[in-house]
């Protein structure tokens, strides 16, 4: 046992200790600065390729003295980065309000022989600290005195009640932390203790966990990996097309137009013109609206997920949830309610209910506050709640019973006794409550030993905490003499547990159906962890074996190489320490899994930070919430399943937009390529292309993002980790629609060229409007991608989608009717509008027919 001076530290010793060990403040994780948040947006691979396009566009602009396209691309970059920055900064601001920490809570310490109350931040190593029921332990320390002391370690180990003692004979060898050690951030559930502070601030267990929670994982988000591949593909395609156009145009100029016959100045100017056209193709290959659109989709999902109790702090987490293949969850407070509840109380004598209620109420030091929350020992509080459910109010019963003597619970005795003068019968009664095997041994024979033993065995099999109640009349006024002399009546056994949240089994079932493995990682006992897993549908005694369950001690003893062959089969890890969970996450990621971690305690923070997505509980510790990407405001595991549905639906919507956007680019590049080969000018102006590529695409992204999440995505397996964002089905649709559009548009151009010998502004206006409405109707094909329903079904849930489409159509009509020289248009007759809208709609009708045939197959 640690040596200490009961008088505490002197003022000089306090100052010296503070100089050596510092203040009792855990260094909070640094919030990203405004500039870092903004700079992070430029790490997006598509933004980088846009920056390159902007530089090339500026170079072309200097040659042609026209910077319209350059300004458009730069505006697209600014909008995309600023929107993402604003939404993440706003989420960070909301989170700060949610997660304020108070280090000024008063703590009782003995210093220089006198009791003082000092702020928690001022406690130093060596201080003698006094703790009692309801208080939070301010520092790590070793107990020098413990009276009926029970600690709620749920924030560190997941255990609600841990007995603490200074008697080595009663130490628990299986406990996660020694029985005479108490840790910062845990709470005193019952009793009283005196401790000597051994570590403060960052040196405490909570401080070390917090430090680990700031270590950044180098894992790239699934969406970023996809966008990196997409940007490389776009870049390569642009370069190949650019080289092809340069070679074709140069060959045509040399072999058909006799370029080499002119003077060197004319040749140089012509070659420069060819080079600028080919560079323009690279610029055109870049989808300017894509970053803005993806950012908008993520931002809108952030806002809409907030309505389902998911406060998203980091934007990428919206989509990453859809790629999750494994969820590692703690038990206490996430799967369970983090409060004890009497599941069953079996009576063994004929004592009237009112008298039994008096015995339970009087022989307890717990209270229920005005909200019904338990103050004091959680198991005793659960008994009071049980009385309330039976229609018995403990307060008048306790007030009516005069307390004669009380013997508090201790780890050594394993029972509590109270002598009362009954307010109901007027008799003097000794009331006893404690471990069933201890209390039963004090009772008079009643022939029920076998029945009681069988009942207790059943409760133990269900990992319940059991508490026996007994009583006897007595003439004694001393508890110990009364218990020794009396032949107690065995009144009953209460079986308590931390109950599973009502919505958890269904939510876990949804995740399992969606192909997501769920793993429980808890500091609780193996039996309790298995029972909870059984209740939520995760553990099957007939199917699961010891290979699916491991203790923290076994886990720590194995090498990474040994564990890599085991972790994917693991369903439960019990008696886990904080860093075990982080190591498990790292190993699962090495196996190719995308890991989400849930937790509410300080012990969960390192894993929350290291996971692909960290999900903390709204009522969790500040350390856990700081380390997470998403905070579940309703503390519900069901919100995790909802977040997965949102993530998968969001990824599908992003795919739809990529399909829509790249179809536009594919068609525009093909038209430009053919035009360059045949020597015709580009039929679309830069301003018209910017309207299509930036403004219209932004509206299209909003339309796709507005689509409601589809519950059907939860029937699918997680997408393969290395699956490209452009699937084969997308590529087929893209090329088919793109080629049809190009054929229609080029057909129009060649027909006009043959019949009229040139292109008028009216014809170019018809061309522009046809191009836009082909994209307009193609949005329906994008909406219908990977769905089992007609795009025109579920109109009620897609109101925003159709309103945005209406805005695009109205915008196009206004541009044509009033755009004039800026957009190079002239007004069209209503019959021309009818022909354009009607004929271009065939691309949506055709897509609908193809999908209907596919559904029948």
List the predicted regions and their residue ranges.
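Alpha-helical transmembrane segments of multi-pass integral membrane proteins
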Residues: 707, 733-748, 773
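Hydrophobic alpha-helical transmembrane segments and their immediately adjacent juxtamembrane loops
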Residues: 720-734
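Long hydrophobic segments that form regular secondary structure
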Residues: 750-759
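Transmembrane alpha-helix entry/boundary detector in multi-pass membrane proteins
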Residues: 760-764
């Amino acid at each position: 046992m640690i040596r200490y001076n009961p008088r505490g530290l002197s003022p000089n010793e306090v100052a010296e200790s503070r100089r050596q060990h510092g203040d009792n403040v855990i260094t909070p994780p640094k919030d990203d600065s405004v500039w870092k948040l903004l700079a992070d947006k430029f790490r997006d691979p598509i933004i980088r390729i846009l920056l390159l396009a902007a530089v090339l566009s500026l170079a072309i602009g200097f040659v042609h003295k026209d910077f319209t396209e350059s300004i458009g691309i730069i505006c697209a970059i600014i909008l995309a980065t600023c929107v993402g920055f604003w939404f993440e900064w706003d989420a960070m601001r909301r989170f700060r309000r949610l997660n304020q920490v108070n280090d000024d809570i008063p703590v009782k310490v003995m210093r220089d022989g006198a009791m003082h109350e000092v702020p928690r931040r001022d406690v130093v190593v060596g201080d003698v600290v006094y703790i009692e029921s309801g208080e939070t332990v301010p520092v790590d320390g070793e107990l020098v005195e413990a009276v009926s002391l029970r600690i709620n370690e749920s924030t560190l180990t997941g255990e609600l009640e841990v007995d603490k003692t200074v008697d080595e004979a009663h130490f628990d060898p299986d406990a996660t932390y020694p029985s005479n050690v108490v840790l910062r951030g845990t709470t005193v559930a019952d009793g009283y203790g005196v401790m000597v502070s051994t570590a403060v601030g960052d040196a405490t267990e909570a401080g070390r966990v917090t430090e680990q929670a700031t270590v950044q994982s180098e894992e790239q988000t699934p969406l970023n990996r996809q966008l990196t591949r997409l940007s490389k593909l776009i870049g390569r395609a642009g370069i190949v097309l650019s080289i092809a156009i340069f070679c074709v145009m140069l060959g045509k100029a040399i072999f058909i137009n006799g370029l080499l016959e002119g003077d060197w100045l004319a040749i140089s100017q012509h070659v420069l013109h060819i080079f600028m056209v080919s560079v323009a193709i690279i610029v055109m290959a870049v989808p300017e609206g894509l970053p803005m659109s993806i950012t908008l989709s993520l931002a809108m999902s952030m806002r809409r997920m907030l309505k389902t109790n998911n406060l998203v702090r980091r934007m990428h987490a919206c989509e990453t949830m859809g790629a999750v293949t494994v969820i590692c969850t703690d038990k206490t407070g996430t799967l369970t309610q983090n409060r004890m509840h009497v599941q069953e109380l079996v009576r063994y004598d004929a004592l009237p209910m009112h008298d039994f209620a008096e015995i339970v109420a009087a022989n307890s030091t717990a209270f229920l506050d005005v909200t019904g929350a338990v103050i004091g020992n959680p198991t005793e509080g659960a008994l009071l709640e049980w009385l309330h459910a039976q229609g018995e109010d403990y307060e008048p019963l306790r007030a009516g019973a005069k307390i004669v003597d009380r013997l508090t619970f201790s780890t050594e005795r394993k029972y509590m006794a109270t002598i009362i003068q009954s307010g109901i019968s007027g008799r003097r009664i000794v009331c006893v409550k404690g471990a069933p095997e201890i209390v039963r041994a004090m009772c008079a024979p009643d022939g029920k030993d076998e029945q009681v033993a069988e009942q207790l065995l059943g409760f133990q099999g269900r990992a319940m905490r059991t508490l026996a109640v007994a009583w006897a009349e007595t003439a004694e006024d001393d508890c110990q003499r009364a218990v020794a002399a009396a032949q107690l009546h065995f009144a009953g056994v209460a079986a308590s547990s931390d109950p599973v949240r009502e919505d958890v089994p269904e939510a876990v079932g949804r995740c399992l159906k969606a192909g997501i493995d769920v793993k429980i990682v808890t500091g609780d006992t193996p039996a309790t962890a298995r029972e909870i897993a059984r209740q939520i549908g995760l553990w099957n005694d007939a199917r699961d074996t010891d290979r699916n369950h491991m203790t923290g001690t076994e886990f720590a003893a194995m090498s990474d190489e040994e564990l890599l062959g085991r972790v994917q089969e693991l369903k439960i890890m019990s008696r886990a320490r904080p860093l075990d969970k982080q190591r498990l996450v790292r190993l699962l990621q090495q196996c190719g899994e995308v890991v989400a971690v849930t937790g509410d305690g300080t012990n969960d923070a390192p894993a929350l930070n290291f996971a692909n997505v960290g999900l903390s509980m709204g009522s969790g510790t500040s350390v856990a919430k700081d380390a997470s990407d998403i905070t579940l405001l309703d503390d519900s595991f069901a919100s995790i399943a909802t977040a997965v549905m949102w993530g998968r639906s969001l990824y599908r919507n992003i795919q739809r937009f990529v399909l829509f956007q790249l179809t536009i680019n594919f068609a525009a590049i093909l038209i430009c390529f053919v035009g360059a080969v045949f020597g015709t000018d580009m039929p679309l102006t830069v301003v018209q292309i910017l309207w299509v590529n930036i403004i219209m695409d932004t509206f299209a992204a909003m339309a796709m993002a507005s689509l409601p999440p589809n519950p059907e995505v939860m029937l699918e397996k997680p997408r393969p980790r290395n699956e490209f964002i452009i699937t084969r089905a997308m590529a087929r649709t893209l090329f088919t629609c793109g080629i049809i559009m190009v054929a229609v548009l080029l057909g129009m151009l060649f027909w006009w060229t043959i019949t009229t010998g040139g292109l008028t502004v009216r014809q170019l206006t018809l061309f522009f409007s046809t191009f836009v409405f082909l994209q307009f109707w193609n949005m329906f094909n994008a909406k219908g991608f990977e769905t089992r329903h007609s795009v025109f079904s579920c109109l009620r849930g897609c109101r925003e989608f159709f309103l945005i489409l209406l805005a695009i159509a109205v915008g196009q009509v206004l541009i044509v009717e009033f755009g004039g020289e800026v957009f190079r248009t002239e007004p069209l007759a209503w019959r021309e509008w009818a022909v354009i809208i009607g004929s271009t709609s065939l691309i949506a009708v055709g897509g609908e027919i193809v999908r209907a045939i596919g559904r029948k197959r």
